[in-house]
């Protein structure tokens, strides 16, 4: 007699002895249906074989060898089942410990994941946004400072251009003044040369006047001597009053001529000396004016040179400050860019770590689901084992010995009934959704 019921994905089969127990779990996430199967194994011992009691009817003796053989086989079966159950219990205990550990790890990961979902991303985002806003404010401030410095640089460049133009103008004026000064120096040199020449002429004229005076005195002396000699000769020879008058007249004429020549010479000398003195005075005044103008131009050139050096120093200082500020701004900008890149890398790393935690959490959920399925499977296996253990005892009680006494007639054969129960359980997400039982009864 054999009865069949509906089968599910998980099957518990009984086959020939010697099969080792093994359980396989297959998870299908697409449909949520879990397929559990087990390899064929024997949860019962070898079938009970009862040999007929050999009864010696002639001597009226009952042979209980069949009974002792049945008891030995049953004892061996129970021992094997006990050892097998102990191994299954140990494996089940280890699985339970593993499940507890994984559940604890799962709880820790869930708590960490909730913490990361609830706190860290938002706080990290706020920190990132705050730092980003701060960096943007600093960049805006630096841009404003840069614009201000560029305006100042443009103003300084304009002032520098104005000063350069002024310097060029002043340099042109200085060159013109130097040219005028050189011209005045030439004029002064010419005036000094003319003065020296005039002084030499004056000295020559004075020498000539002195010489003429000497010549005139010598002539007057000679004339006087001649007159005296003529007067003596006249006095000796002719002592007439008309000769004396003539001599006086001649003397008066010569004296008048000498006086006129003397006056003309003195007047010419005075006029020449006055002309030379006026020319020298005029040249001296022009020389003093030229020297004064040269000194004024020299003072102006010195003042402009000092202003130019001061402006050059200020320009160099401002250019140096501008270069330093540009370098500092470039360094700070590079630092801010590195900070932004580092923060972006940290955010990317946190995102990747979060994704990894999510993947680990999903894997742990899958493992937990598989373990829940295995636990449910082992629970059903244990329940099936408990129900199977009760079967041999019931079958053993069903053994009937027709002849139990010496004077009774023993049936030639003892009939043994065997019953095999196969329970099939179908689970989904740790819950039993379908359960079926197949029972087979074999008659020897």
Curated annotation (Swiss-Prot):
Residue ranges constituting the IF rod domain according to the UniProt record: 81-389
Segments for region (Coil 2A): 243-264
Pfam families: Filament, Filament_head
UniProt record, GO biological process: intermediate filament organization; regulation of chaperone-mediated autophagy
Region annotation (Tail) ranges: 390-444
Region Linker 2: start-end pairs: 265-268
Start and end residues of each stretch annotated as Disordered: 1-47
Chain spans, region Coil 1A: 85-116
A GO-annotated cellular component: cell projection
Region (Coil 1B): 128-226
The keyword Coiled coil is annotated on this UniProt entry: yes
Region ranges (Coil 2B): 269-389
Keywords: Coiled coil, Cytoplasm, Cytoskeleton, Intermediate filament
Composition skew (Low complexity), residue ranges: 33-47
Compartment(s) where it occurs, according to its Swiss-Prot or TrEMBL record: Cytoplasm, Cytoskeleton
InterPro entries: IF_conserved (IPR018039), IF_rod_dom (IPR039008), Intermed_filament_DNA-bd (IPR006821), Intermediate_filament (IPR050405)
Disulfide linkage: none
Self-association state and partner proteins as the record states: Forms homodimers.
The name this protein goes by in its record: Glial fibrillary acidic protein
Gene: gfap
């Amino acid at each position: 007699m054999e009865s069949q019921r509906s089968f599910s994905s998980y099957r518990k089969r009984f086959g020939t002895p010697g099969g080792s127990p093994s359980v396989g779990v297959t998870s299908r996430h697409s449909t949520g249906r879990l397929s559990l199967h087990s390899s064929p194994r024997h949860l019962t011992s070898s079938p009970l074989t009862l040999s007929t009691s050999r009864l010696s009817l002639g001597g009226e003796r009952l042979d209980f060898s069949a009974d002792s053989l049945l008891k030995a086989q049953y004892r061996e079966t129970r021992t094997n089942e006990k050892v097998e159950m102990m191994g299954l219990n140990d494996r089940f205990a280890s699985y339970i410990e593993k499940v507890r550990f994984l559940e604890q790890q799962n709880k820790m990961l869930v708590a960490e994941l909730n913490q990361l979902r609830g706190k860290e991303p938002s706080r990290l985002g706020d920190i990132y946004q705050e730092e980003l806003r701060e960096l943007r404010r600093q960049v805006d401030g630096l841009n404003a400072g840069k614009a201000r410095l560029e305006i100042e640089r443009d103003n300084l460049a304009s002032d520098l251009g104005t000063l350069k133009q002024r310097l060029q103008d002043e340099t042109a004026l200085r060159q013109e003044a130097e040219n005028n000064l050189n011209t005045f120096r030439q004029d002064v040199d010419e005036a000094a040369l003319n003065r020296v020449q005039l002084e030499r002429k004056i000295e020559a004229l004075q020498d000539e006047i002195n010489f003429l005076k000497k010549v005139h005195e010598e002539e007057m002396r000679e004339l006087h001597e001649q007159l005296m000699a003529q007067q003596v000769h006249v006095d000796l020879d002719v002592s007439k009053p008309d000769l004396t008058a003539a001599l006086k007249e001649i003397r008066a004429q010569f004296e008048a001529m000498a006086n006129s020549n003397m006056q003309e010479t003195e007047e010419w000398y005075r006029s020449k000396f006055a002309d030379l003195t006026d020319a020298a005075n005029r040249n001296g005044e022009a020389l003093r004016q030229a020297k004064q103008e040269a000194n004024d131009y020299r003072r102006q050139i010195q003042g402009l040179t000092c202003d130019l050096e001061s402006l050059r120093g200020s320009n160099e200082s401002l250019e140096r400050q501008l270069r330093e500020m540009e370098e500092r701004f470039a360094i700070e900008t590079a630092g801010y860019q590195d900070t932004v890149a580092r923060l972006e890398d940290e955010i990317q790393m946190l995102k990747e770590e979060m994704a990894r935690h999510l993947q680990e959490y999903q894997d742990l959920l899958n493992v937990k689901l598989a373990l829940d399925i295995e636990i449910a499977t082992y629970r059903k296996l244990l329940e099936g084992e408990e129900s199977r253990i009760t079967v041999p005892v019931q079958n053993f009680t069903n053994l009937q010995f027709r002849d139990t006494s010496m004077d009774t007639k023993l049936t030639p054969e003892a009939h043994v009934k065997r019953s095999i129960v196969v329970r099939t359980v179908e689970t989904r997400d740790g819950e039993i959704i379908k359960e079926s039982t197949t029972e087979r009864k074999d008659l020897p």
